[in-house]
Amino acid sequence: MNLSRRRVSPIKPGETIDYKNIDLLSQFITEQGKILPRRVNGISAKQQRAITKAIKQARFLALLPFLNQDI
């Protein structure tokens, strides 16, 4: 019997996806700085596109690093 559970979205209903919200965006990137795929995040396709766009914008404005140099 396949009991699949609905995942709870890590993005709260009233929370906006914005490039300035670094705490939210850092949940969706790996330690190396790569953007996590949608199947790992458990978010909708629309939210994934918005997260990706916000992460890229934050990287461009130097709010997030392109690569993690701590390795």
From Swiss-Prot:
<dbReference type="GO" id="GO:0003735">
    <property type="term" value="F:structural constituent of ribosome"/>
</dbReference>
<comment type="similarity">
    <text>Belongs to the bacterial ribosomal protein bS18 family.</text>
</comment>
<keyword id="KW-0694">RNA-binding</keyword>
<dbReference type="GO" id="GO:0006412">
    <property type="term" value="P:translation"/>
</dbReference>
<keyword id="KW-0150">Chloroplast</keyword>
<comment type="subunit">
    <text>Part of the 30S ribosomal subunit.</text>
</comment>
<dbReference type="InterPro" id="IPR018275">
    <property type="entry name" value="Ribosomal_bS18_CS"/>
</dbReference>
<keyword id="KW-0699">rRNA-binding</keyword>
<dbReference type="GO" id="GO:0005763">
    <property type="term" value="C:mitochondrial small ribosomal subunit"/>
</dbReference>
<keyword id="KW-0687">Ribonucleoprotein</keyword>
<dbReference type="GO" id="GO:0070181">
    <property type="term" value="F:small ribosomal subunit rRNA binding"/>
</dbReference>
<keyword id="KW-0934">Plastid</keyword>
<dbReference type="InterPro" id="IPR001648">
    <property type="entry name" value="Ribosomal_bS18"/>
</dbReference>
<dbReference type="InterPro" id="IPR036870">
    <property type="entry name" value="Ribosomal_bS18_sf"/>
</dbReference>
<dbReference type="Pfam" id="PF01084">
    <property type="entry name" value="Ribosomal_S18"/>
</dbReference>
<protein>
    <recommendedName>
        <fullName>Small ribosomal subunit protein bS18c</fullName>
    </recommendedName>
</protein>
<dbReference type="GO" id="GO:0009507">
    <property type="term" value="C:chloroplast"/>
</dbReference>
<keyword id="KW-0689">Ribosomal protein</keyword>
